[in-house]
Structure formats: structure tokens, C-alpha cells
Amino acid sequence: MENQLTKSVEERTFQYQDSLPSLPVPALEESLKKYLESVKPFANEDEYKKTEEIVQKFQEGAGKRLHQKLLERARGKRNWLEEWWLNVAYLDVRIPSQLNVNFVGPCPHFEHYWPAREGTQLERGSMMLWHNLNYWQLLRREKLPVHKSGNTPLDMNQFRMLFSTCKVPGITRDSIMNYFKTESEGHCPTHIAVLCRGRAFVFDVLHEGCLITPPELLRQLTYIHKKCSNEPVGPSIAALTSEERTRWAKAREYLISLDPENLTLLEKIQTSLFVYSIEDSSPHATPEEYSQVFEMLLGGDPSVRWGDKSYNLISFANGIFGCCCDHAPYDAMVMVNIAHYVDERVLETEGRWKGSEKVRDIPLPEELVFTVDEKILNDVSQAKAQHLKAASDLQIAASTFTSFGKKLTKEEALHPDTFIQLALQLAYYRLHGRPGCCYETAMTRYFYHGRTETVRSCTVEAVRWCQSMQDPSASLLERQQKMLEAFAKHNKMMKDCSHGKGFDRHLLGLLLIAKEEGLPVPELFEDPLFSRSGGGGNFVLSTSLVGYLRVQGVVVPMVHNGYGFFYHIRDDRFVVACSSWRSCPETDAEKLVQMIFHAFHDMIQLMNTAHL
């Protein structure tokens, strides 16, 4: 990835889009076989027998018919899932998306040239903006290298959704507005929006056809910051984006009915490249401990976040940065890519601007002054209170395991991602005394507009291994053998899922066909084992590998009694971030992370002692 980012290439970013294969529909029999295997850890014999009968009936009856209809749909679309997934996973969801759906992550610059330091916010911010805008230009010019797996190009469509993209709330379903264009496609917006102390501003990032420089960006930021510091706090319209979706949709309609100019102002935020947030708070952040950064990124002041924007770049008063992104238009790997690019530039320049200090005579930022009334101001304070109350329930444990990392697991011929997934299974098993149904993201970008598939990490093999680790009579060799079986199973599942042979999205497709056709919901989806094994968004462990770079992220748990678990892998360490809800008496993110680190040691020890 690193050299892919920086080498200059002839290939254009989006040149392979039209030649990517369509997303396949797996064989029904295969999907159902895999589904049955995945429910086994959560069933006793009688329950499993009953589910087996339900699956058999489905395969020969309703499932067969629905599968045929799904194949018909797939014949007419290059990606049969895309529109459905967007609607079901994101746009139809009514709970507040800023806290519950968005993903956040700190920028890793505090590990090197930019440790937390008061008084650095605006100057560092001007350089952050500059590097981000350079990335935007690379994308506009299609100079961003195509991601590949070996020599196979991967789908790059999600990168179109990074800039000038915004979700717009609807009464029953939201929509996504995307205004980005490459240079060859024509003009697109060239302004950014800045939120500070409840007020909103916009300014253009091009002057006479060139990007404005860090000294010029600093002048714009200083103007905004000074103005907001010396005058009363603004109406905080942005806080409405943290509301329940239908409430926000109604508040937005009302806001526009107050004054049509309000729509023009909303559209300036929607079309902006991204939103830059100037925060007054200073989260504690060291390379070893930065849980507070995550908590503030997800749960911080909603009046300086536009929750629906695909990219909020957030700056804190102590010069720490992070992002808060709407998950609907793209997956986290897009943000990982730009965050890594910016971090590399900060390293290269030692965090300083070494160019001209000249500031041209560029127009000052324009404030977006909304027409508001008592009702809107009440809606805003209700939204703020709702968001801050819900966010106070969130616990995030961000920790770094430094005893070893990828280098050692590779030496033992263990895949580092699988290593972490199995450690999580063992930790959950030890902490809760039962297996935990688990969702790990696999990417399906080999296919046209491919996004993700579910790897169900809690396998029969993983559970057998966990049991052997807790069984004092099991020998080291037996434990090691069971662990290696669990590794092999996980690696195969990950490969299958990435190549379009998962089953969760397939089952979702069959359910949605039934709904669209007005048919009864098949028994398979109403079977208690369907949800107990994670189906229908019920995974107690919602997890993802963030990558092999310095970038980290987190999302809230999928269910109230669950965990979100996100991690990245380096040669000498594993960096993890775990989320849980404080109001759930049985979960504790801190404890789970400690147990995972304990499991890392046990697993490596198992490999070492079993060699003897």
C-alpha cells in the first residue's frame, strides 16, 4: 500500500471500472451448507436438528424460487446487491446515524511530529487542509494509483464518495448526494465548510486556478476562529444531523419552509469538499493511550460536526486531529488511504510548511447565516441533549499490544489477522463463558462496486479450540492442533468471502426478494437460531481489520450487549480499539481488551512449547 500511494503511475484511478467482473450469486446449496455450519456453535442437538429441517425445506421450496428470482435480478445488474445494501444497511435506518453508524479515527501524527500541544490547532490545521486538498487534486486528476491484489485491479468507485458527498435525511429513507467529478468529467465544487462554535463558514480552496497555500489557509482559519471567539455562539444547526433520522428530516423541511435561502445554505454544506471542525476541547492523547480521542470524535460536540457528511476532518484545541465519516457512501479503507497519505506528508515535511509565506489577496470566508426561530432552536437543543446523553453511555478502550506483532506471527506461519480474530474468540469465551457470534468484514472489491461480505469468525473449530484452552486435561499438542484447525478454517472463509462465496449477503438478497414480491418471510429468517448466530444484525462481536498502516478507527457495537472491535497490525505491535455500552452490565471493553492481550501471549506460547 505504502509504495502504491507514492509512486507516480500512468494508470488512471478509475480506468478499470468498466472491465471489473459483476458480483456473482453463490450457489444456493453452498450458501445454506455454510449457514448451517455457522449456527452450530449456538445450538443444542434438538435446536440444530430443527434448523436443519427448516433449511432443507427452504432449499427445496421457497428458497429455490427466491434464488431463481435473484439470478434474474443479477442478470440485469452488474452488482445485484449494491442498491439493496445501501438502503437496508444505511439509508432506511432511523436511529441517529452520527453516533450509531458513523466511523471515526484519530490521525496518527501525535505519534511523531505533532504531539498534543495547546496553541497549535490553527497552524497545524492549515497544513492538514493542504495535504488533504492535494489528495483531492490527485483524485480529480485520476493520479491516485489503482488498488490491486497482486496484479488484479480492485474496484475504486468508493473513492468518488470521499469528497463533496452528503447524506440528506428523508422521512422514511435518506438519500446520498454526490457532487464529485474528475477533471475530465467537468467542474465540481471547490469550497470547504468550516464549523466553529455553532457557526458555519465556507471558502474556496482554489485561487486563480491553484490551491491556496498553508499560510493562506491559516489566514482563513484565523479569521473564522477569531470571529467566533469574540462573538456569541451560533445557532448550531449542525447539531440537528445527530438526531433520529425522521426527526432531522422534519426539522430540515421546517428550516427550509422558514426561508428558502436556508436551502441554499444547506446545499453549500452538502456540496463542500468536506467539513472542517474547529473543536474547543483537548482530548488526552499519547501513543500509548488515546481512548479519549475516540470518545470525543464519536460523542463530542454535535454543533461542530455535520454528521451526514462523508468526511468531517476534526481539529482539537491541542493540535490533535481525527475524522468522523458517514458510513453509507463508503467503507473505512477509503479513509485509511487518505489518512495514511496525509501522515506520510506530515512525516516527509517534519510537520512544517517549507514553502512561501506569501499570502495573496483572497476573499475572506463567507458565513452561512441561517434564518431560525424558537422551534428550530428548541430542536437544536433537544438534538444536542439526545446526542450527548447517548454518547455518555459509550465506553472505548484503545490500547497497544507491544510484546510482538506481525513479524513474529508470520515467523510462526500464522496469519496475523486470523491470529487476532481467534484471540478475540478465546477472550470472549473466557470472559462470558460462551461463544460469541462474530462479524468480520471481508472486502469484495474484486467485483464491480463490491463493498463487503460477512466472515462469521465464531466457527465450530474456533469453539473446540477455546474449549480445549479451558480444559485442564487437554495436552499442549491437542490445543495446538485445534488452534491450527481453527486458523485453517478462518483463512478459507476469508478467501471464500472475498471471492464472492460468502452467504450472509446472499441470504439477505433472498429475504429482500421475498419482501419485494410481497411474499411471507421464510421460516429460516424467523428461526431463533438465525438471530442467535448473528443474522439480522445481531452479532455480539462486530469487527474489522483496519489495515497494516498506522491508521486506527472504531464504530459502536452492533447490539446493546455486544462489542465493536477494530485493530491494525504492525511488524512489532497490534493496535486495538474496542467499544461497548456502559449501561450494559455484562460487557466491559477494558476487560475484553486485557483478555485479548492475555490470549495473544497464550497463543504464541502454545506455538513455542508445542515445538519442544
UniProtKB/Swiss-Prot annotation:
The modification N6-succinyllysine is found at residues 40, 57, 406. Changing residue 335 to A: Strongly decreases activity with octanoyl-CoA. The active site is at residue 327. GO terms for molecular function: carnitine O-octanoyltransferase activity. One of its GO terms (cellular component) is peroxisome. GO terms for biological process: carnitine metabolic process; coenzyme A metabolic process; fatty acid beta-oxidation; fatty acid metabolic process; fatty acid transport; generation of precursor metabolites and energy; medium-chain fatty acid metabolic process. The keyword Transferase applies. (R)-carnitine binds at residues 439, 441, 452. This is Peroxisomal carnitine O-octanoyltransferase. It comes from Mus musculus.
